[in-house]
Amino acid sequence: MAAALVLVTGQGAAAVPLRVDQAAFRDIYRELVETDTSAPAGSCTLAAERMLARLKGAGFGASQAEVFVPEGRPKEGGLIARIDGSDPSAKAMLLVDHIDVVAARREDWPRDPFRLVEENGYFIGRGVIDDKALSAIWIDSLIRMKKEGFWPKRTIKVALTCGEESGEAVNGVDWLLQHRRDAVEAGFALNEGGYGITDANGKPVALYLAVGEKHSQSFTIEARNPGGHSSRPRPDNAIYDLADALTAIRRFSFPIRLNATNRGYFTRMAPIVGGDMGQAMAALGKGSTDGAVVAKVTSDVTYNAMLRTTCVATMVEAGHAINALPQRAKATIQCRLFPGEKVEGVEAQLRKAIGNPAIALSRDGGKGEAVAVPPPLDPAIVGPAEEVARKQFPGIPVVPNLLTAGTDGRYLSAVGIPTYGVPGIFLDPDGNGAHGVNERIRVKSVYEGRDYLYALIKRYAGR
C-alpha cells in the first residue's frame, strides 16, 4: 500500500496528501457525517451499528463492543466499547460523545447537508464540528490502539450516545447511568466542550480545556387579568404587568462567582487579551471583586456568562384577540446556572427581583436533568494536556475554561465522574456555523486535533 493517499476536493483540486492512517480516519468521519442522526428523521442506532461494524472489523469481540437501544426508542441507540487495562486497580477512563445532530433542511443548504464535502480547506456538512469529528476520533483511536497492540494500564471505555441535541429524545448518557452503569463507570471522562481558539487570520491562540459547565433551567412567568373590551382600557393590564416583570429581570444581575476554573481562565488569558481588559482580567484572576474591575470584565457578554448565573427572556405569548384586553400574558425565561448553583435559589432570586406576587413563576418541565457539578482543576488532567500541547502546539497555552453552555457531562459529573472537555481542534472566531447552514471545520484542524487527542488518550491511559 502506498505511504500516502491524495485526496481530491469537491472542486477537483488536489488537496494535501493524506497518510494511510489519516485516510482511514477520514472514512470513519465520512460515514458518521453521512449518516443522518437528527431527530426525528435520522437514526443514531444506524450510526452506532456502523461504528460497531468498524470495531468488529478491527478485531473487537462481542464483550468489547456493542450497540444499546433504549426500550421503545429504536432510533435512539448508541455504542459502548472498551479496551481492558493491565492494572485492575487503576480506575477506567471514559471517552464520551454524542452522535445526534441538529436537524438540517435540504432546501436551506446549497448542498446535501448529510454528505461530507471538502472545499477550500474546510470539511462541510451537518455535524462536522458538533460533534462527529470527536466521535470519529474516539472510534479511530480504539482501532489504532488495537492495530498497534497498545495495552493501556487503565481500561479505556467509549460511549457514543444520542439525545444531547433533542429534548424529545432519551438522553443516552443518562440512560446508561441508570441501566448500564458498568459501561460508563470511570475515574474521569473526556468529552466535548474543549476547543482551540484562533485569531481572525486563523492563527492558534489558546487551547481551552473545559473544566465545568452550566446547567440549563427554564421558567415561565405569567400575568393574568379579567380582561374586557379594548374600548375600555383599565389601569391593570396583563401585558403591562408582564412587561414590568421582564424589565425587572433585565435589570437584575446575579452575583459574580469566582472559582478555580474562571480565575485560571482570566489569569492565563489576561496577557493574551492585553490592554485595559487584560489588566481587569488579571485582577479578577487574583480574586479582586472591585466594582470597576467587575464592570470592565462583564462588559464582554462571554466573560459575563463565565462569572455568574444568567437569565434571559426567550419567548413571549400574550392576548387572545385584537379587540380585547389581554386575560393572560406569559414569557419563557431561560437560565444558565453557575456550576453548583441550586435551581431553588435561582427561583427565589427571580421572585424577589420581580417583586410582584401576582406574577406566577413556575419551573418548566423536563427530564429532571442533573445540576452541573464542577470537576476539580486536577493537575493529573491539566498536566498531561499541557505536556502533549507543548509537543504538538508549541507556544500555545492550555487554558481552563468554564463552558457557558451545557453538555452530557452534567450527568456524569453529578454522579461523581469528573468530566472534562478536551481541546485539540481549533475553531474559527465565528463559531464555524455549528447548528446552522454550511457547518464547517478546517481540514487541517481536524487532523491536528486527531493527533493531539490520540497522544493525550495514551498519556492518560499509561502502559
Each PLM stretch: what is its role?
Residues R54, Y195-V205, L209-E448, Y460-R463:
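Metal-dependent amide/peptide-bond hydrolase catalytic core
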Residues L18-R26, T37-A48, P74, V128-D131, ...:
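Solvent-exposed, acidic/flexible segments
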